[in-house]
């Protein structure tokens, strides 16, 4: 469609603002950890809606349709049973795109979680507070929940100069969800990424957890 670089960047911001805000509302409403595939449906619908020039009613339609069809993607199932399902991102994007196309075709949707009164505060900051500014690139190629002990091991090795062979035991103190990450020797890349013992061991031996350590 001849989208300019400025319009592309603006649309990217729209995607993140919609995804994060809808994600916060959805997470609170259902009281269990959803994954990024769920929120990606909102972000994709909002982004495509902007590129297609949707008005307010059309955008609300697309977001409602996206919510009704978004993947459930329970986070802890990915943690307990690592596989290529991971966070359901591909189908979240597909649902968001289909929601925009359905809106163009005349399908309607009414209401979505972010519109509920208890989440009004998430809408009131639109245009003044940007959630995209709270994002970053993950430094290690594994679940974010394992990053704190990885960083701690790397920093300690730099500070005290010990060799991997000097380490006999490692005790990790972390939050409950992170303790449910796998602690076995992985046989697949997915098992290596949804793990806590393996990445920590890699950080001690290699000083990093990148692509070579999880393949």
PLM regions: where:
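N-terminal core-entry segment
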Residues: 1-136, 176
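Terminal-appendage/accessory-domain detector
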Residues: 81-94, 101-215
